[in-house]
Design a protein with these regions (language model features):
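Substrate-binding pocket helix/loop in short-chain dehydrogenase/reductase
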Residues: 90-92, 98-103
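Conserved NAD(P)H cofactor-binding loop of Rossmann-fold oxidoreductase domains
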Residues: 82-87
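Conserved glycine-rich Rossmann-like NAD(P)H-binding loop of the short-chain dehydrogenase/reductase
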Residues: 25-42
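Conserved glycine-rich cofactor-binding loop
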Residues: 11-12
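C-terminal helical subdomain
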Residues: 174, 192-228
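Residue(s) in the substrate-gating loop at a strand-loop-helix junction
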Residues: 134
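Active-site helix of classical SDR
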Residues: 114, 150
Length: 251
């Protein structure tokens, strides 16, 4: 019987890489995103048009409800919560509605879809959920306050739910990538941040699927960011926030 995977944010760099890799592993695909044109192109490119496409804006209640309905009618073996975006600038000067939409996509949608998928997975006694967090969530990040806070939630939420789900045969993996070569930082208007070299999304997805195969609960990619994770865990948070502000302010 063919296994099925649902990928949110499927038309972005990481989502496309997941689509290619999972198709190669024999998964049937449900590809979701906001653009019918981009989803159709992706389905045709990856599967010859056999993948199911679902147009849904996860920044809206209607979009979230659309995917809840899909998951309830078509339980999946693997859920990839990849959709997300960030904004850049001082919080007081950013559009509040846009920041709330960011939380809706990064937190509310992810939490809702995880809850929905877990219902069928725990009943079946198997399944896996991959939630894409970020190394940005390791520390308070001035100029990306909402984004860093949302990704801290994703990481901690995934680890906690993963412990609960394990006894039901369900695996939850929290993935914390560093900068990845995608359109994210164009969307975030964060060109001023000195990021260094960005990772290839194909490499991130390969590492994620290896971690999934090994039943790991958490992945930090590339591995050098485990150092950042350790340091931010022992240093005073106020000091870490000030240091992050200095780094993000470099031109």
């Amino acid at each position: 019987m063919t296994r099925t995977a649902l990928i949110t944010g499927a038309t972005g760099g990481i989502g496309r890489s997941f689509a290619h890799a999972l198709h190669e592993r024999g998964y049937g695909l449900i590809l979701t995103g906001r653009s019918t044109e981009k989803l159709t192109e992706l389905s045709q490119t990856v599967t010859g048009g056999t993948a199911q496409i679902v147009v849904a804006d996860l920044g809206t209640t209607e979009g979230i409800d659309t995917l809840v309905d899909v998951l309830e009618r078509n339980p999946v073996d693997l859920l990839i919560n990849n959709a997300g975006f960030g904004s850049h600038g001082e919080f007081a000067h950013l559009d509040l509605d846009h920041e709330i939409e960011e939380l809706t996509v990064n937190v509310r949608a992810l939490m809702t879809l995880t809850h929905t998928a877990l219902g069928a997975m725990t009943a079946a006694g198997h399944g896996a959920i991959v939630n894409i967090a970020s190394v940005a969530g390791f520390q308070p990040l001035p100029s990306m306050a909402t984004y860093s806070a949302s990704k801290a939630f994703v990481d901690r939420f995934s680890l906690a739910v993963g412990v609960e789900a394990r006894k039901h045969g369900v695996h939850v993996l929290s993935v914390n990538p560093g900068p990845v070569d995608t359109q994210f930082f164009t969307v975030a208007n964060a060109q001023a941040i000195e990021l260094g070299r960005s990772a290839n999304p194909d490499d991130l997805v390969a590492a994620t699927l290896t971690a999934l195969d090994k039943k790991r609960s958490r992945l930090v990619f590339p591995r050098v960011y485990y150092v950042l994770d350790a340091l931010t865990g022992v240093l005073p948070r106020s000091l870490v926030a000030r240091a992050a502000n200095v780094v993000s302010g470099r031109k």
